[in-house]
């Protein structure tokens, strides 16, 4: 395999599968990705001071990888009002956060107008403190809420944008293959529906991230197809701000008990996903984020030498990974994030949601 040709060449899905299957050139693949990272984004490693706000853990979804969900009436169930969400956002803003990531569940009482009320309250309460970027509602949440409100996705996104939605998390992607989705998240939106929601968001002027959850039942061909779909969307809309690989946290997830399911990804696969995504996307998607919550500090630092150039955020509150068995904490101070980056000889810089550097 002529790896150096991949530095300039646009990879096909076949090339991508071959890279995932290649065990002999593991370190050369990482080295190539790091070289591309340096060419495309330099030695700066970005981070965002942010807070996660999950406004409910009650959900009608049937995702088999989720350990966060609660049923109505469960002693640990909660549902925050728009005013309560806004107060949490204000607390985050007062402690220096420039972004809040707001997500909830799938319920009949959550429609587009409820989501818009959350946005409105957050924008109003933080205005005195310079405002805050709101990164909220997954494609699945947007679609479900639109249906509950009797709106099209396009109409719903227009309302959300008018009420202050700055960007959306590109979660609910998992693996963009309907055969895989039918096993791991049978009632979630189909691949074509996920594509429609994010593409419509981009055309409405709402940027999104994009994600891929791996290390469960997927095969290499599914990873290649997923990356190919994301690249195609980016070529058409340019609306993805970053790619975030999400390693499957298996410990508490119901999916873990299925016969075919792996016990999460190996450390080698984690690093390969970062590297191959960098080689595959090149500068179509310039920013690749590593997740210290899922990988831990040390593996995240290594991933910065395998294609990644962003270490995510301080989070302040992160419940979903913790519920699934994540053991790396739910908050990291800005100073610790900087130290993480400096320790591997790179330059830490704070950014906002749109990857603009905050001096």
UniProtKB/Swiss-Prot annotation:
One of its GO terms (molecular function) is iron ion binding. It catalyses: 5-amino-6-(D-ribitylamino)uracil + L-tyrosine + S-adenosyl-L-methionine = 5-amino-5-(4-hydroxybenzyl)-6-(D-ribitylimino)-5,6-dihydrouracil + 2-iminoacetate + 5'-deoxyadenosine + L-methionine + H(+). Pathway: Cofactor biosynthesis; coenzyme F0 biosynthesis. Keywords: 4Fe-4S, Iron, Iron-sulfur, Metal-binding, S-adenosyl-L-methionine, Transferase. Pfam families: CofH_C, Radical_SAM. Its EC number is 2.5.1.147. [4Fe-4S] cluster binds at residues 59, 63, 66. InterPro entries: Aldolase_TIM, CofH/MnqC-like_C, CofH_family, Elp3/MiaA/NifB-like_rSAM, F420, FO_synthase_su2, rSAM. Binds 1 [4Fe-4S] cluster. The cluster is coordinated with 3 cysteines and an exchangeable S-adenosyl-L-methionine. Coiled coil: none annotated. SMART domains: Elp3. Residues 45-282 form the Radical SAM core domain. It comes from the Archaea. The keyword tRNA processing does not apply. Its cofactor is [4Fe-4S] cluster. Belongs to the radical SAM superfamily. CofH family. Consists of two subunits, CofG and CofH. Catalyzes the radical-mediated synthesis of 5-amino-5-(4-hydroxybenzyl)-6-(D-ribitylimino)-5,6-dihydrouracil from 5-amino-6-(D-ribitylamino)uracil and L-tyrosine. This is 5-amino-6-(D-ribitylamino)uracil--L-tyrosine 4-hydroxyphenyl transferase 1. It comes from Methanococcus maripaludis (strain DSM 14266 / JCM 13030 / NBRC 101832 / S2 / LL). The lineage of its organism: Archaea, Methanobacteriati, Methanobacteriota, Methanomada group, Methanococci.
